[in-house]
Amino acid sequence: MFLHGTSRQNQHGHLEIGGVDALYLAEKYGTPLYVYDVALIRERAKSFKQAFISAGLKAQVAYASKAFSSVAMIQLAEEEGLSLDVVSGGELYTAVAAGFPAERIHFHGNNKSREELRMALEHRIGCIVVDNFYEIALLEDLCKETGHSIDVLLRITPGVEAHTHDYITTGQEDSKFGFDLHNGQTERAIEQVLQSEHIQLLGVHCHIGSQIFDTAGFVLAAEKIFKKLDEWRDSYSFVSKVLNLGGGFGIRYTEDDEPLHATEYVEKIIEAVKENASRYGFDIPEIWIEPGRSLVGDAGTTLYTVGSQKEVPGVRQYVAVDGGMNDNIRPALYQAKYEAAAANRIGEAHDKTVSIAGKCCESGDMLIWDIDLPEVKEGDLLAVFCTGAYGYSMANNYNRIPRPAVVFVENGEAHLVVKRETYEDIVKLDLPFKTGVKQ
């Protein structure tokens, strides 16, 4: 069993996170419960930033808020001096509600609506990452209408395949995102933006995938982009002030995962950018990166209460908990794997193989297959580790189950940052079906 960040076994034999006993958290806030180790988030943020500071380079480390967005999380990102990557009007609204500096917000997405782009312009955000020709035309029209101007990056697909799950590989040519780097699309986009009266082309962006454990993809992407930048300088007199190489830095979910440290990713990116800038005679552009999962993923733990059990003789022992695919859909969606422990008996031998089932009325609602735990019983507390990314943000009300609360823990204190949904919350937007209305 691998404990991340400040997680440890305390004197009572319980799991402790951020100096707070997991049993206390479950008793006070209920389960399922998302618990975030704030100290670990801070540590990761500082590691990414310090690597650029040590190199003496201009850079922005933008938190990819789709991993986990709440007012408190955005405020924590601001406190750590991060920029912010948003991908919807809702994420932008959350950032505004949190008081995040608009000039450090970058707006991504492949189908931004007119209303979302208008919102971005009205709040004077720092940059829009343009994804397609439709968006260029729409943005130009809105800028004329509102009298605003905007800096943009062009999202390109460099044709670099990250060694990761197909569903989250986004840098290949066959992708819903961005302009293809090799078929002339990017050149057409550059021409269109350079002709604009209101849109300023700041640079280019790419994202090659997620849960990446080496740096080869980032190096190759940088090489391909700089080769094109050299051509674009000659063709359009365009010099990229910003190079955004995205995120996708991996974390350790299980013992099979071997991610690099944050500084190792950044140092290799810096090396690749410096080398290619020198090769083609460019000044080093400002480098942007977008860590999301790598900032919050292993800082999150979900606490569940054990309920029923079912034994299939000679096959498997099922242990059911009070959550499931409604609070963590990743196992069903991506076949994601997690480690877990009995939080109230974490020091005991984990020597009985069981499978953890969710409570949803869905045969595929399985959180973990074949994991070793102590002999668990009803009422035991199960901790599933590394649920900080894409757990709460992908949570849903399937089976009309309320979404869990979220707690931040740090220095022995717990702070509720998202309230648990109630049944009243689930029906508050519903309207009755009225019969007998005359037409």
Swiss-Prot record:
Role according to the record: Specifically catalyzes the decarboxylation of meso-diaminopimelate (meso-DAP) to L-lysine.
InterPro entries: Ala_racemase/Decarboxylase_C, DAP_deCOOHase_LysA, De-COase2_C, De-COase2_CS, De-COase2_N, De-COase2_pyr-phos_BS, Orn/DAP/Arg_de-COase, PLP-binding_barrel
Similarity annotation: Belongs to the Orn/Lys/Arg decarboxylase class-II family. LysA subfamily.
EC number(s) reported in the record: 4.1.1.20
Name of this protein: Diaminopimelate decarboxylase
GO MF annotations in UniProt: diaminopimelate decarboxylase activity; pyridoxal phosphate binding
Coiled-coil residues: none
Cofactor(s), names only, from the UniProt record: pyridoxal 5'-phosphate
Pathway: Amino-acid biosynthesis; L-lysine biosynthesis via DAP pathway; L-lysine from DL-2,6-diaminopimelate: step 1/1
Name of the encoding gene: lysA
Residues the entry annotates as binding substrate: 293, 330, 334, 362, 390
UniProt cross-references to Pfam families, sorted A to Z: Orn_Arg_deC_N (PF02784), Orn_DAP_Arg_deC (PF00278)
Annotated catalysed reactions: meso-2,6-diaminopimelate + H(+) = L-lysine + CO2
CDD domains tied to this protein: PLPDE_III_DapDC
Superkingdom assignment: Bacteria
Organism: Bacillus subtilis (strain 168)
Top-tier EC class: lyase
Location of N6-(pyridoxal phosphate)lysine modifications: 66
Swiss-Prot/TrEMBL keywords: Amino-acid biosynthesis, Decarboxylase, Lyase, Lysine biosynthesis, Pyridoxal phosphate
Subunit structure: Homodimer.
Binding positions (pyridoxal 5'-phosphate): 248, 290-293, 390
SUPFAM superfamilies noted in UniProt: Alanine racemase C-terminal domain-like, PLP-binding barrel
Cited HAMAP family: LysA (MF_02120)
Enzyme active site: 361 (proton donor)
GO biological-process terms attached to the record: lysine biosynthetic process via diaminopimelate
